[in-house]
Amino acid sequence: GTLKQVFETILSHQSDAFRQVVLVEYPRRGIWTIGFLTGETLGEVQNITKDRVLNIFIPTTPNPTSGFLLFIPEEDVIELSMGVEEGIKMVMSGGIVTPMDRRSESDRKKPKV
């Protein structure tokens, strides 16, 4: 029905804009959130910061079309193995829909953080 149409519309428009699903500590250390890499920061913002910074969009639940644009140092961004569509589904469902961990068994045993 209607929810399916909204979901498909959001996926079709945002899947192209979002390059990678990432994990970042936000709004403070020790609290993690899903974000989407939208590009590498360029121009004045990059030139003012001492680190290489990435554009990370932090969506709101259940509507991932609104959210926050954060400029986060690359070293503080963890790339996830889930696809963009899986990440959007996770956000839209409020975490009810959670994709399987696609990493190898050995990688699962090594915490990144």
Report the location of each language-model feature.
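Transmembrane alpha-helices and immediately adjacent membrane-cytoplasm interface residues
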Residues: G1-Q14
